[in-house]
Amino acid sequence: MFLQTLRLTMPRMFLHMKPSPITITRACTVPSLLSVAAPQPALVAANRPLVFNRGFKVRTSVKKFCSDCYLVRRKGRVYIYCKSNKKHKQRQG
């Protein structure tokens, strides 16, 4: 009984309220949480492959760890790169 009364009176409660032009503009321009769908993980993974780039270890003295490591001098700094193990990347700081 209460739910029927509530259901019938709810639309009448809002009849006297008229939306202002600002409210209408906000409703049209500001996306609500309900209208914006969250990206699904399967779609995100399909669009962008996950590529992890290793950063440089910043050290005062750099050294080669294996035979594949090689030294490069750029921008006044010494860099160590490695073809076989990306963990060996270093930058002299």
Curated annotation (Swiss-Prot):
Q: Which GO terms describe its biological process?
A: mitochondrial translation; ribosome biogenesis
Q: Which SUPFAM superfamilies match?
A: Ribosomal protein L36
> Mostly located where?
mitochondrion
Q: Which HAMAP family match?
A: Ribosomal_bL36 (MF_00251)
PROSITE patterns this protein is in?
A: RIBOSOMAL_L36
Relay the record's extra comment.
Present with 500 molecules/cell in log phase SD medium.
Q: How does it assemble?
A: Component of the mitochondrial large ribosomal subunit (mt-LSU). Mature yeast 74S mitochondrial ribosomes consist of a small (37S) and a large (54S) subunit. The 37S small subunit contains a 15S ribosomal RNA (15S mt-rRNA) and 34 different proteins. The 54S large subunit contains a 21S rRNA (21S mt-rRNA) and 46 different proteins. bL36m has a zinc binding site.
Tell me if Mitochondrion is a UniProt keyword of this record: yes
Q: Where is the transit peptide?
A: 1-35
Pfam families in alphabetical order: Ribosomal_L36
Protein name in the entry: Large ribosomal subunit protein bL36m
InterPro entries in the cross-refs: Mitoribosomal_bL36m, Ribosomal_bL36, Ribosomal_bL36_sp
On whether Transit peptide is a keyword of this UniProt record, the answer is: yes
